[in-house]
């Protein structure tokens, strides 16, 4: 692989080269010979090379068109690998055949919208093993009552079981990012953690609750324009005190709250 390619700052590129961490990512994803792996952002192909040796099939989505011919030259095109010039935020994941494991070293500036997109198409995935900015990984895995617990925590934990696998220092990358990174695995749940009457309304409630996280639920949820009588019944009907703040509610409590307010 040509090592003279310079990382594009505009694409948030930081190329992971350290074979120790590349192997650990594949281990964390539990990539085996029967697995189809979707790699987002193969970059210079260092992780791709590890995945191709382990997986049945690797589909690599790369936004940087400079890298496509280099990746194709390195790996060729065959039954075991396909390299596409594609934007992970626009890709039609619904068109994927069967189930896939996602493995990705995500550009940090778009990691949250990509996670949301992948979660929206979770039916296509067994798991997501993602290299993220450490603080985002911590946020995803945080329990209720923690300062890092927020909308993304609830959304991910509703549909997946997150686990922080390990931290990766800046010097494992070229160029070095200014922050620590962490690999997190999200194992997609067969069913959401909570049975919901209306998943879209649940998401609206959680977004509203965390949009003003210093305020009580009573004040933060006013934007939903639920009638006052129903708001007064929340405590007696759900056991949830609207004097609490969003960060104290579990996913299950958000489910009860949303189902009642939306009924």
Where are these regions (language model features)?
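Catalytic cores of RNA-modifying enzymes
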Residues: 1-207, 236, 247, 256-263
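C-terminal lobe and adjacent flexible extensions of AdoMet/dcAdoMet transferase-like proteins
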Residues: 188, 206-263
